[in-house]
Amino acid sequence: MIFLTLEHILTHISFSIVSIVITIYLMTLLVHETVGLYDSSEKGLIATFFCITGFLVIRWIYSGHFPLSDLYESLMFLSWSFSIIHMVPYFTNHKNLLSTITAPSAIFTQGFATSGLLTEMHRSTKLVPALQSQWLMMHVSMMILSYAALLCGSLLSIALLVITFRKNVENFGKSKSNPFLIGPFSFGEIKYVNEINNVLRNTFLISFRNFRRYQVIQQLDCWSCRVISLGFIFLTIGILSGAVWANEAWGSYWNWDPKETWAFITWTIFAIYLHTRTNKNLQGINSAIVASIGFLIIWICYFGVNLLGIGLHSYGSFTSN
């Protein structure tokens, strides 16, 4: 009973901290001179990491197995993975663009895990025979870590597309409304001095904003590639370890189970993404489009089988209890 109480306390503390972190992020968007608040939000997500770590350790102790046997535990582990990804740039003293992705992702996954939809899964149960293997920790942890990294990288790519599209729309609108920026100057009388000053000022502001957006786009592109590359490595390890485990449990390395099929599709999509990164003509928007497609594929792979409750991996589904 004490373990369940500790679980309950830790999950609610971590969820509350993440909620506060997101509130602080919103405040920093409104008020830029809040370095102290921003640093507090960074440390807040680190505190969330330790709370979820405590939850996983406690659940591991009293259940007797690694806490990745059902959807509830995997969602908590996914939230824990988002926290890890968040801490990497923080401790390497890089500008943490991931924080705008990891914090909302953590609160979304943890909020869904602790919601009433998964109440029956909150109490740990005995492992089904298929999961009673030392490969459980290796295979499932690698897959969840890959989902977290690939989701973060894909969201960064989606942000890149949004900023690029918005920039193009704004430039088109400004070119329509400001003839000084696209056509010959029509200066008549003595007002031409003021008109020239206005044109130069507008041109400078537009150039500065475009330069800042260019920098943000380049950073988003760089970080999305890094995070997706890491996630692709985890995904490859997870699929290979799962194949070995499947051979031990079911006598075959690959069965084209729905989960296996969508994992292969996910791997293929992000392999295409990494291939586009090797071609300079396909980098940027083209590779971001591929990553955006991958974002949808990951959710189908992660939740699709769980919603349907079919195939060899149905023990982690909503209908398994």
Swiss-Prot record:
Keywords: Chloroplast, Cytochrome c-type biogenesis, Membrane, Plastid, Thylakoid, Transmembrane, Transmembrane helix. May interact with Ccs1. One of its GO terms (molecular function) is heme binding. It is found in: Plastid, Chloroplast thylakoid membrane. Belongs to the CcmF/CycK/Ccl1/NrfE/CcsA family. The keyword rRNA processing does not apply. One of its GO terms (biological process) is cytochrome complex assembly. It holds the Pfam family Cytochrom_C_asm. The chain crosses the membrane at residues 9-29, 44-64, 71-91, 97-117, 143-163, 227-247, 261-275, 288-308. PANTHER family: CYTOCHROME B_B6 PROTEIN-RELATED, HEME EXPORTER PROTEIN C. The keyword Thylakoid applies. GO terms for cellular component: chloroplast thylakoid membrane; plasma membrane. The lineage of its organism: Eukaryota, Viridiplantae, Streptophyta, Embryophyta, Tracheophyta. This is Cytochrome c biogenesis protein CcsA. It is a multi-pass membrane protein. Its main location: plastid. Required during biogenesis of c-type cytochromes (cytochrome c6 and cytochrome f) at the step of heme attachment.
